[in-house]
Amino acid sequence: MPTIVSYKWTLINNLKISDNQLEELLFKLKSEVKPIDADHVEIEVNNDRPDLFFPYGIIRAAKGILGKELGEPKYDIKQSVYSFEVKEVKSRPYAVAGIVKDIKLDDESLRELIQFQEKLHITVGRKRKKVAIGIHDLDKITSTKIYYKPLPLDYKFIPLNQSKLMTIKEVIEQTPQGREYGNISIYDGLSPAIVEENGDVLSIPPIINSDKTRIDEKTRNIFIDVTGTSFEAVSSTLDILVTDLAEMGGKIELLNFISPSKFEFSPLLRRYTVSVSANYISKNLGINLSLNEIEKYLRMARFDTKVLNDVVEVTVPPYRVDILSQIDLVEEIAMTIGYDKLSPKDYTIKATGKLSAETELIRTLRDLSIGAGFSEIFTFILSNDKRLRNEYVSIVNPVTVEYNAVRNSLIPTLLNFLKYNQHAIMPVYVFEIGDVVIKDKRTDTGYKNSLRAVYGIMNSKVNYEDLQSRVHQILMSLDIEPTYKTYLDDMFIPGRGAKIIDTSKSVEIGVIGEINPVLLEELEIEFPVVISEIYLDSLVKR
């Protein structure tokens, strides 16, 4: 979980509490605190609460638990004279911007603000791949019109902490930030950029800001840009930033927002409602709460509420990105009450667990297979589509072409295993039990998992009977009497392949045969191979 370092006295003085009370409060916020020195503490915060990555976000939440402030905070929001226009940027198409005025920064709060930015980069931003943030001194921006657009790599500006003009290409090649993040956003020789109307660069996200708009302790008015690959992510990140800064006493200003989106102003500061009944809360918490009590606890968690009949309608603030459904509100109530105040209850239903029929079959089959002289292997369920036949599930945007499909049979992965183990001492006896994914129109997705077993023998001399005798004995040990029916398939040598039939049910339960030399040559396997695949789904039901 993310950890932040905070100036202890910011928290204690704003909340008017002791060190011990601070520890108790943070525990109620699912956070842990430990001292670093006389003035600083390290706080471990949950990933799902990015609004707590900044001390003033913690102060806002803690004031609710203490009962000092209830409901959603009301911020001073005005319309700005500034505009922010988003042009087409193919590599990172989404951008939003906001302004916060009249903040007071000192050495500690400046460090905490930069830390806040970096924690958001690492978590929500996925190391700037999904979201990147630029924080600027608004008073150093000379134009009221600001643009997000692509720039050529020979465009020049002075990057942060540099003293000379550099091209974007030089920044990427010569600065630590450029070497780390430069490959994220460059597309077709162009880089995303935040630019003033006069052409001055404010930043080239996700790499670096311009030195022109560097923030320091004298900064009082801030311009924030947030860019990335997800509109939802960039807009919610900006909401978190401006509302946390507003807790310092800052005043939020909305920019005129010109973009392909339907929104006219930025930040969006969107709210939504979640309705929850008293019965649902009581059932999940195990205690009976009245509607008035539910309202009280939710307002302590800094939500605005409205009671409609037996339901509480909860307005979720823009910065609470962790609230997705009713159960999240139940957790908020539990945290506000305090988990130490909730008594555990014994289960009223007692039952004895046992292995499933599928697990029993797998264990028995594994023992029988090892007893028959086979060694077990484990291969990936993902495979290369060139190895598969018939219909299979393809992977969208695979990490590597080697794993761009889901196997629909265990045979291709076993053959691939044998290909890379031809150096082993012969003969090679191997088996695998695992899932494949096959077509099934009766399911919602059109596909289903199917449990199978595969057996293979590779040797300088091997034939159908060498494997058939072993597979036959294994099936007989499972109380299955198999019969064999000729099976013609390109995979097998003609006349040397068969379907395996469960005699009692007249159901096909597998195939067996000698692999065609043509296929072996394609796979670069130099030894004869005989293989059998057993369909275990029908056997589980016995």
Swiss-Prot record:
Domain named B5: residues: 269-344
UniProt GO molecular function: ATP binding; magnesium ion binding; phenylalanine-tRNA ligase activity; RNA binding
Reactions accelerated catalytically: tRNA(Phe) + L-phenylalanine + ATP = L-phenylalanyl-tRNA(Phe) + AMP + diphosphate + H(+)
Any matching Pfam family: B3_4
Swiss-Prot/TrEMBL cofactor(s): Mg(2+)
Compartment annotation: Cytoplasm
UniProtKB keywords: Aminoacyl-tRNA synthetase, ATP-binding, Cytoplasm, Ligase, Magnesium, Metal-binding, Nucleotide-binding, Protein biosynthesis
Enzyme class (EC, first level): ligase
InterPro entries to which the protein is assigned, alphabetical: aa-tRNA-synth_II/BPL/LPL, B3/B4_tRNA-bd, DNA-bd_dom_put_sf, Phe-tRNA-ligase_IIc_bsu, Phe-tRNA-synth_IIc_bsu_arc_euk, Phe-tRNA_synthase-like_B3/B4, Phe_tRNA_ligase_beta2_arc, PheRS_beta_core
EC number in record: 6.1.1.20
BP-aspect Gene Ontology terms: phenylalanyl-tRNA aminoacylation
One GO cellular component term: phenylalanine-tRNA ligase complex
Matching SUPFAM superfamilies: Class II aaRS and biotin synthetases, Putative DNA-binding domain
Annotated Mg(2+) binding sites: 322, 328, 331-332
Highest taxon, organism lineage: Archaea
Predominant location category: cytoplasm
Family as reported in the entry's similarity comment: Belongs to the phenylalanyl-tRNA synthetase beta subunit family. Type 2 subfamily.
Subunit structure, as described in the record: Tetramer of two alpha and two beta subunits.
Protein name per UniProt: Phenylalanine--tRNA ligase beta subunit
Gene (name only): pheT
